[in-house]
From Swiss-Prot:
Source organism of the structure: Schizosaccharomyces pombe (strain 972 / ATCC 24843)
Keyword Phosphoprotein: yes
CDD domains membership: DEXHc_Mtr4-like (cd18024), KOW_Mtr4 (cd13154), SF2_C_Ski2 (cd18795)
Residue ranges, compositional bias (Basic and acidic residues): 16-40
Pfam families: DEAD, DSHCT, Helicase_C, MTR4-like_stalk, MTR4_beta-barrel
Protein name: Uncharacterized helicase C17H9.02
Amino acid sequence: MSENSTDSKNFQFSEGSRESSNDELKVLLRDTETKEDEKSSFSNSEEESIIENLSDSSVNKEYAKNSLKLSDAVSESKYLNPLLKDKRHDRSFALHKVVVPDDYDYIPLNKHIPSDPPAKTYPFELDPFQSTAIKCVERMESVLVSAHTSAGKTVIAEYAIAQALKNRQRVIYTSPIKSLSNQKYRELLSEFGDVGLMTGDVSINPSASCLIMTTEILRAMLYKNSEIMHEIAWVIFDEVHYMRDKDRGVVWEETLILLPDAIRFIFLSATLPNALQFARWISEIHKQPCHVVYTDYRPTPLQHFIYPQGADGIYMLVDEKNKFKTENFKKVLEVLDHSTRQENYSKSSKKVKKSSSLERIINMVLSNRYDPIIVFCFSKKECEINAHQFGKLDLNDTENKELVTEIFDSAINQLSEEDRGLRQFEEMRSLLLRGIGIHHSGLLPILKELVEILFQEGLVRILFATETFSIGLNMPARTVLFTKAQKFSGNNFRWLTSGEYMQMSGRAGRRGIDTKGLSIVILDQSIDEQAARCLMNGQADVLNSAFHLSYGMILNLMRIEEISPEDILKKSFYQFQNMESLPLIKEELMQLKNEETSINIPNETAVKEFHDLKLQLEKYGEEIQKVMTHPDNCLPYLQSGRLIQIKLGGIIFPWGVLVNVIKREFDPNTREQVAPHETYVLDVLLPISSNSMSNHKVNPSILVPPRPNETPLYEIVSVLLTAVCNISSIRIYMPRELNSNESKLRAYRRVNEVIEEFKEIPYLDPLEHMHIESSTLSLSLRKLEILEPKLFDSPYYKDSKHRAEYHEFRKKLNLRAQIKDISTKITNTEAIIQLRELKIRQRVLRRLGFCTLENVIDIKGRVACEITSGDELLLVELIFQGFFNQMPPEEIAAALSCFVYEDKSEVSTLNLKEPFKKMYLTIIEAAKRIATVSLESKLQFNESDYLHQFKPDIMEPVSLWINGASFQEICIVSKLYEGSIVRTFRRLDELLKQLEHAAIVLGNNELKEKSVLTEQKLHRDIIFSASLYL
């Protein structure tokens, strides 16, 4: 790659044949002075790509956290790797496995006689994985189809539907999200005709032979033992890997357990490393065969590139044959290292640099006709900022502009004139006319669908989207671009998992149109090679159970005679995965015991005495350090320039320099609960590793010292006083300005000079220098004086042979601790997991009067079973208190909005107007009573988190809407994204329907009529505009 600098903002391909180039997308900045021989192509060296289970590899910590541990489930890589090595990317490759229950008369698939005529024919030749899966369907046997996005999994679902209709049977098609259900309804309606749709928002033709519904609707039907379930032959679960979702995955798992054994299943999924484990679970709980058909074949091969921020081009990291380019990765690191060493940018400079990078890459893609392009951003705000950055770019000609206008106007004609004038419509129209789109959850649903339709029609050439666009919707592009490789996970930034990356990058490459798809990642910080391999060349995320108990689940199962809550626990995928892990855990335990037995220490008693002596000394050292670092004792000495040493996560950092001390501010109500050492924050100039940085900022969660031979970064790190382990008697001069890298480096040079001069940094003495008067300190110092000579005189301290024996003793102790932990894990695994929690939750229900002492559901419990869109216990308590009895519709809706609003709360109780404040405080008081009963029942429960889930932010806008306010008016009052308002109001509509049903069960006609009236007032205008897919 050329090193010449340039101000040009355009990218171009290097000259030469694109077809013959191994590194096809070697891209350079246009530089007229660059000589031809300087345009050297990337190295052709290729390393064998790796398909590995993350649990078997020592990878970056962020990946390890998101991977399946061997102790938690059985690795399936041994089933896939040998077969995949050479043929996994060929169209001819399809791996087939089947799990068969005992006593089942199974006929091998190769003896299957195809249906004649088939239930459905196709105008193209089926891929082998499709043909294999269809054989399973024809035999009326369940099948899990695991393949990449756009591989053609829908073919199997269509065949099952055609076969069911041919045999006069009914079939259910479930999807994780409503928008996907709407889109699938449109597709299948045009194909089969006899199709219905059932979601929380709409019900169309519920008597149809093929019903499309969300998983929540299917679960509700199972709870109520709906007659429809006796007529169903097949249930198709689209995007079944969604079962790992921590919030809604449990709904899929519960539904799968409750479905009758006579029903057969089709599971469509992205590639799953533990697909066979999932099939074993299905076979066990439903006593039927379950096939697994797996392919790693991509109809459109994918090439992966990285643009290291600050570079003059992009680098291919993984080619279309899945080969990882090690030499190119080294070049990426060189560029990133050079960029990191440069002067620190101000925030605005960084944004300019990032936006410039994005502009250059998109211009390169457009100039080489590698559009359409999906640009994945990781926040709604970033989507909009990036889209508006291209304000002058126009990608549509006059004819396309006319088409966009026609489709746009036709879509919004159903709306009132006032709603059509909303700011979001005006801004999006301007972008769409120029071929640019935005897609995120803050958009009005009708706008999101409009963008999807225009994108499918080729009228949107650049789409800025959040991650949700990659779920289910069949809308591929030629190129996918990631604005970064990290996402915010609630507390801090983390690397994308390989599964997340695969899901999004899989949108690149349109089958039958593109010869290759391109995935480009903008990288702004260093990443180690193993983590890069796992990201771009790794394995999909393992399907781990997200099963957890809820009161709604327990109460609904109390109503069903055939199955109990205990049965659900026994049959859960969570329990199954843990039980399957037992052989591996026991094998690991045996290995540890053998290793522990093999360690022979001649005089173990003497070694233990030395070890106990060391522990005593460490204990007294910690007591001394705790006294020395107490604010009352150390604050007078914590001046700017003081050399101090900190310890984080058990790691002691090199000496740092104190920059500033700040006293923390606390809520007066919690002040007494905070330890004195936690009341102060220290800003310390520290040498750290480049791996401690995230988005040009220090990331405290990954803070580590420099590695050996690594050039350190010098950054100001904020730590609590508890992190201080040593204070020096030396204080150096500190400059006022410490904003640039150069100023920090200059300041730290003085530390190195002190180290060179003193060899060992002198410590601040607690008695001589600090004059601390403390009986604890005196006693600890005295004991140190007595015990230290014993330590220094011990042969296990002085003699190398004895030190080696002590090292073996430490190793043995560590093994014993592991043996104890694993033995405990085995004991817990062999018991029914979560059974104790179930018993505690049943105790809570009994104390609150939702069931009898014999765990038989009572009237309060039956009312609670009708509520699924809000906290059922709290709502039922409020109903029985008569909370809603005297309320007009606008107050009922406002109160219920506290249960359905899910965005971050920005409203303080102090700022609430009446009557909203009084209503909200009543809700919180009732919630506190439930919290008290839960805690008294010994439920592991965070009262603060529980109370904070009820948010008053949208009470006033909801009340205004019920009283006839326009959508524009409530947008101004709420200051939320339009899409967030619509989403919350639609959840509120569902909750109102459930309140109506609860009132019917209770026999409260007045509350029922109020619920219906409130729903009627809520249900109007743009918030409930029909889907464009219907």
